[in-house]
Amino acid sequence: MILFGSTGSIGVNALKLAALKNIPISALACGDNIALLNEQIARFKPKFVSIKDSKNKHLVKHDRVFIGQEGLEQILTECQDKLLLNAIVGFAGLKSTLKAKELGKNIALANKESLVVAGSFLKGAKFLPVDSEHAALKFLLEGKKNIAKLYITASGGAFYRYKIKDLNQVSVKDALKHPNWNMGAKITIDSATMANKLFEIIEAYHLYDFKEIDALIEPRSLVHAMCEFKNGASTAYFSKADMKLAISDAIFEKQDTPILEAVDFSKMPALKFHPISTKKYPIFKLKNTFLKEPNLGVIINAANEVGVYNFLENKSGFLDIAKCIFKALDHFGVPKISSIEEVFEYDFKTREYLRS
C-alpha cells in the first residue's frame, strides 16, 4: 500500500490496521510531522518517502526522500503497488488522486476534496470510500434497486448544543472539541460549520451517481447512513464512531477481522434525528444549488480553506468562515469549467481574491 497523509488521523489508524494484517507499506508521505514519520519509517520500512518541504529533508531517516507534489507523483509512478490511500487534507490531495487514476491504481479516498472540486474529471477512477458515511452507503447499496433517497448523518459538531447567538464568541479551542470523533483540525472545524457534510453529500453524488441525497443530525454518531426505498422500506448502517472500520473496508481484501465492538442494541440509548438548521449552519443552504451545479465545488472549497485557516490562525472569527464562502460565490458565480487546468485556475483565483 502507498499511504499519503501518514501522520494524520486517517494515516495513523490505517497503519495500525496494516500492522494487524501485515500489509506491506511501500511508501509514506506526510507534511511536517517528521518525528512521527521517522517512527513510521522505522516500523514499516517503506521503499519511498515524501515530505512537503525540502528544508526538512535532512531530518528524515531514509535514503529515498521525495519532495512536494512532484515527489508524490514520482512515487506513484515508480511504486508498483496497486493501492493508494490518499489521506492528504484539502485541495493539496487532488494531484495525487488524478495521477493515481491515470495509472489505474485503486484509490482508498479520504481526500473528499478531490471529488468536491473535480468529480467530473474523476469518472472511471477505482474508488474505495474511506469516509464512514460513504463506506456505510456502499454496504447499504450493494445489489439494491428501486432506491428513493439516501441519507448520511452528522453529529452537529462541536457547537451542536450552542445557541446561534453564542457562536460569535467561540474560540478555536472550543471548535476543536468534537463530541464523538477524534480527527484533524481542518475536518473538525468543517464538522462544526457543516461544510464537511455539504462536501460529503457531493462526494456521495459522485461516488454513487445519485442526486436524491440529504443529511440529518444524529448526535450520537451511531447511525452513519440510511437508504430509503420506493416501496417505503428503509435500511440503516450502525456502528460505533471509529474510523478504523471504514478504513479497513477500503484496504482489506476480506472483511473477516473484528475491528470494533458491535453496537449492543439492548443497551443503546434512544436515537433522535434532526434536520440541519440553515440558520445555525448557513453553509448547508448550498446543498441543492451545489447538487445542481457541481462546478461550484472549486469555489466553495477554496473559500472554505481560506476561511478555516484564517480562523485556526486567529485572524478571523468562526462565523467568518461561512461569510468567506458566500463572498467568493457572489464574486465568481457558477464557473464554466471544461478542463482540469481550469479547476486549478479557479482555485488559485478564489484564494487570491479572498486574500486581496
From Swiss-Prot:
PANTHER family: 1-DEOXY-D-XYLULOSE 5-PHOSPHATE REDUCTOISOMERASE (PTHR30525), 1-DEOXY-D-XYLULOSE 5-PHOSPHATE REDUCTOISOMERASE, CHLOROPLASTIC (PTHR30525:SF0). Pfam families: DXP_redisom_C, DXP_reductoisom, DXPR_C. It comes from the Bacteria. Its cofactor is Mg(2+); Mn(2+). Mn(2+) binds at D131, E133, E200. 1-deoxy-D-xylulose 5-phosphate binds at K112, S132, E133, S155, H178, S191, N196, K197, E200. Keywords: Isoprene biosynthesis, Manganese, Metal-binding, NADP, Oxidoreductase. GO terms for biological process: isopentenyl diphosphate biosynthetic process, methylerythritol 4-phosphate pathway involved in terpenoid biosynthetic process. The gene is dxr. It catalyses: 2-C-methyl-D-erythritol 4-phosphate + NADP(+) = 1-deoxy-D-xylulose 5-phosphate + NADPH + H(+). Its EC number is 1.1.1.267. Pathway: Isoprenoid biosynthesis; isopentenyl diphosphate biosynthesis via DXP pathway; isopentenyl diphosphate from 1-deoxy-D-xylulose 5-phosphate: step 1/6. This is 1-deoxy-D-xylulose 5-phosphate reductoisomerase.
